[in-house]
C-alpha cells in the first residue's frame, strides 16, 4: 500500500522523458538523453526502476537505479536510492516486462547517503538530496560529492547533477549551462493502476 500523495507523484513521474529539443538547440552543451521510470510492483510499495541512456546507445544504460518512494511524517516524500549488484544483467529492463519482474531485493545495493527528499509545491514537485547527505560519486579516478536536484511539473522534468570536490567544494563535473530539460514522450502511469493496492 502506498499513500495517495506517493501514488500521485509516481503517476506523474512514471514514463519516458527526452531532452531532444535541448540537445538539438545546444549540441556542444547537452547530449541527447532518455530517462525512463517504470514501476516494480514485485518489490516494496513505491519501488520504481530508473534507466538513463544516451539516444545514440539506448540499449546500454549509463545509469540504472531502483528508487523507492515513501511518504514521511512531514508529508515530504523520501526517495530511497539503490544501485544493482550486476547492472548489465538488467540493462533494457524498462522495455522488457519479464526482465523487470525478475528484479528482486537481493539484486539491489542501498546507496546510503544518496537518498532524496521531494516536496510538492504550487509549481510541481521539487526534489533534492536529503539535508546532510554526503553522496560520494567516483568520477575520473576522484571522489566527488554529488549535488543533485530535480523539478517535475506536468510533462516537464528538469534535472541538475554536479560533482564537487569534498575539500574545496570546486565543481569537478556536471552541467555548466544549467539544468537538463526533459519532456515526457510517453506515460506509464497505467502500470501503477494495480500496483501496491
UniProtKB/Swiss-Prot annotation:
Its EC number is 4.-.-.-. Keywords: Lyase. It is an enzyme of class 4 (lyase). One of its GO terms (molecular function) is lyase activity. InterPro entries: CpcT/CpeT, CpcT/CpeT_sf. Gene3D superfamilies: CpcT/CpeT domain. Covalently attaches a chromophore to Cys residue(s) of phycobiliproteins. HAMAP family: Chrphore_lyase_CpxT. Belongs to the CpcT/CpeT biliprotein lyase family. This is Chromophore lyase CpcT/CpeT. The lineage of its organism: Bacteria, Bacillati, Cyanobacteriota, Cyanophyceae, Synechococcales. The gene is cpcT.
Amino acid at each position: 500500500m502506498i499513500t495517495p500523495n506517493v501514488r500521485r507523484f509516481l503517476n506523474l513521474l512514471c514514463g519516458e522523458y527526452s531532452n531532444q529539443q535541448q540537445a538539438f538547440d545546444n549540441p556542444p552543451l547537452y547530449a541527447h538523453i532518455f530517462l525512463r521510470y517504470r514501476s516494480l510492483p514485485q518489490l516494496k510499495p513505491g519501488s520504481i526502476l530508473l534507466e538513463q541512456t544516451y539516444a545514440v546507445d539506448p540499449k546500454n544504460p549509463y545509469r540504472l537505479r531502483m528508487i523507492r518512494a515513501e511518504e514521511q511524517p512531514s508529508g515530504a516524500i523520501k526517495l530511497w536510492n539503490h544501485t544493482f549488484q550486476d547492472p548489465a544483467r538488467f540493462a533494457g529492463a524498462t522495455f522488457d516486462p519479464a526482465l523487470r519482474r525478475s528484479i528482486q531485493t537481493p539484486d539491489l545495493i542501498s546507496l546510503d547517503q544518496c537518498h532524496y527528499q521531494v516536496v510538492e509545491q504550487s509549481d510541481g514537485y521539487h526534489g533534492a538530496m536529503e539535508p546532510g547527505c554526503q553522496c560520494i560519486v567516483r568520477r575520473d579516478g576522484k571522489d566527488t560529492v554529488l549535488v543533485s536536484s530535480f523539478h517535475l511539473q506536468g510533462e516537464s522534468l528538469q534535472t541538475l547533477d554536479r560533482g564537487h570536490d569534498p575539500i574545496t567544494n570546486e565543481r569537478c563535473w556536471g552541467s555548466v549551462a544549467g539544468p537538463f530539460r526533459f519532456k515526457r514522450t510517453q506515460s506509464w502511469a497505467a502500470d501503477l493502476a494495480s500496483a501496491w493496492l
